[in-house]
Structures are given as structure tokens and as C-alpha cells.
Amino acid sequence: MNGTTNFDRTNYFQNVPSTALDLALWMESDRMGHLLGVIDQARLDEQRGVVQNEKRQGENRPYGRVFESVLRASFPEGHPYRWTVIGSMADLNAATLDDVQEWFRTYYGAANAVLVLAGDIDVATAREKAQQYFGHIP
């Protein structure tokens, strides 16, 4: 189980045997549909620290801040691609619990998601399982 984020999307992915498909779908639907209820200030602060450490690690590598300079030189003031996906330390420090919850409600629902299943599964079963696990999520 892993995930990545870029300018236009966040993706979560799992490579599992077909015998673990129900568990994987349950975990992803739980993240999408029920995570918001357990995000509190303590968890936000913990994850903020994790992200800040990731940012510092990137910046402390040789040429670690070059990409920021390239973005500023490539995109006009106000363009969303002008800054890195991770944001600035000031952005990270300023994010509130309300900000995170609103972002989650706006962007991380089933209406904005694409589910891809590949492997030992037929289309009818995939559709049935998608409805079972994600159908109740707005």
C-alpha cells in the first residue's frame, strides 16, 4: 500500500493477490469514506511533522531547491504550478484542521475518484465490488 501526490492528483495503490481484493477495497473505501471522522488536531500535527521532515530531506539534497526555482521561473504569479506540491513551511504551519477537513470533503470523495482493478477479476465482479465498497460514499 502506498500513495503519491502531484499537481493534479493524489493516488493510492495496492498490489494484492485476488484473494485479498475485498480487504484492499475495504481499506480504500474506509480511507475515502470514513477517515474524515478520525482526523483530529493531534493526528494533523503528527502528519504535519512527517510532511515537514520529507520537505527538509528533499531540500537538504544537492540541488534540492532547484525545482522550486524552475517552477517560479516557468509559471506566472498566482499560477498553481508556481510552487511545489508539498508547499512551503509557512503553508504547512498555517494549515488548520478546518482546512484539512474541507479539502478532504471537496476533493477526496467517490465523485472525484477513479478505481482501477486489473488482474484475476472480470468486469461484472469488479463493478459489483466497486458498488459494494464505494457506492455509499458521496
What residue ranges belong to the model's regions?
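Charge-rich, well-structured scaffold segments of protease-associated domains
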Residues: 1-138
